[in-house]
């Protein structure tokens, strides 16, 4: 890949140049082609069918194609803090986590490193691979990951496109994300859970309840109910919002979500 069109921003920049030159042109993600990893560890606080009893082998990639004002991982996703590594080292990280007992390998915000992800998964892993994403994906990128990802874990952040632009710089987010989610489902089909209650394959749609945006949430729920039958996808409604990142710049985002609304 010379010019990058891997995400819906379709920046068209030469990300190889950003790696090798301080004067390179940065796209929306602000990263070069080599993967940058901020943290890799067993994570016990994902959904129970993902974390299980031993943890999810979570790899947090630096940078992001969204820049959500309220991001809880702001230093990682927006300030790109982390260490640049090779594809070979990335594969080693997968197996280090598996040796520690990881039920799966959980790739967090990996879209801008799709080339490296594909290269690192040329040989199947002995555990499911999870693609943990903002939902702001292209159909082409999802197709390229076919047979490499067993579990899709997309956010469906917004049904309100004005809010998506305001808080995440994501034009046409709702149509883009819902099209992506339908494509993910076509790829892996209805979710499958093993005898230990762990997810083997399928789609979990996440949605974070944002302050003062209850209608946004209700429209997300309506879309899922209208487009999927019971037993096809899982839905994770989250209420752990706290003002992080640049949330203080927006009066509407400085409140903590009310558990009663959840």
Regions inferred by a protein language model and the residue ranges of each:
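Electropositive phosphate-/nucleotide-binding environments in soluble metabolic enzymes
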Residues: 1, 5, 10, 62, ...
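N-terminal presequences and immediately downstream first alpha-helices
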Residues: 1-28
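Short, acidic Gly/Pro/Ser/Thr-rich loop/turn segments
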Residues: 12-14, 36, 66-69, 212, ...
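Conserved Radical SAM active-site core
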Residues: 19, 23-152, 160-162
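Twin-arginine (Tat) signal peptide motif
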Residues: 64, 182, 260-261
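Conserved AdoMet/S-adenosylmethionine-binding subsite of the radical SAM
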Residues: 92-251
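Conserved small/polar residues in nucleotide/adenosyl-binding loops
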Residues: 254-262
């Amino acid at each position: 890949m010379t010019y990058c069109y891997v995400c819906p921003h379709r920046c068209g920049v030469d990300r190889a140049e950003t790696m090798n030159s301080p004067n390179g042109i940065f796209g929306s993600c602000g990263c070069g082609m080599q993967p940058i990893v901020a943290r890799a560890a067993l994570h016990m606080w994902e959904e129970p069918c993902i974390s299980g009893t031993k943890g999810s082998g979570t790899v947090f990639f630096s940078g992001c194609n969204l820049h959500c004002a309220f991001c809880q991982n702001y230093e990682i996703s927006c300030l790109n803090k982390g260490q640049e590594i090779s594809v070979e080292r990335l594969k080693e990280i997968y197996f280090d986590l598996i040796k520690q007992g990881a039920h799966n390998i959980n790739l967090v915000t990996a879209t801008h490193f799709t080339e490296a992800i594909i290269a690192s998964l040329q040989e199947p892993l002995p555990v499911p691979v999870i693609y943990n994403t903002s939902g702001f994906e292209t159909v082409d990128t999802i197709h390229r990951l076919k047979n490499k990802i067993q579990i899709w874990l997309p956010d469906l952040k917004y049904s309100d496109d004005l809010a998506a632009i305001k808080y995440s710089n994501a034009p046409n987010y709702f149509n883009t994300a819902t099209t992506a989610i339908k494509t993910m489902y076509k790829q892996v089909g209805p979710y499958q859970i093993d005898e230990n209650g762990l997810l083997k394959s399928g789609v979990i749609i996440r949605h974070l309840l944002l302050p003062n945006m209850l209608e946004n949430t209700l429209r997300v729920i309506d879309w899922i109910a209208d487009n999927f039958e019971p037993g096809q996808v899982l839905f994770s409604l989250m209420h752990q919002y706290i003002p992080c990142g640049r949330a203080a710049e927006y009066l509407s985002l400085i409140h903590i979500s009310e558990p009663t609304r959840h």
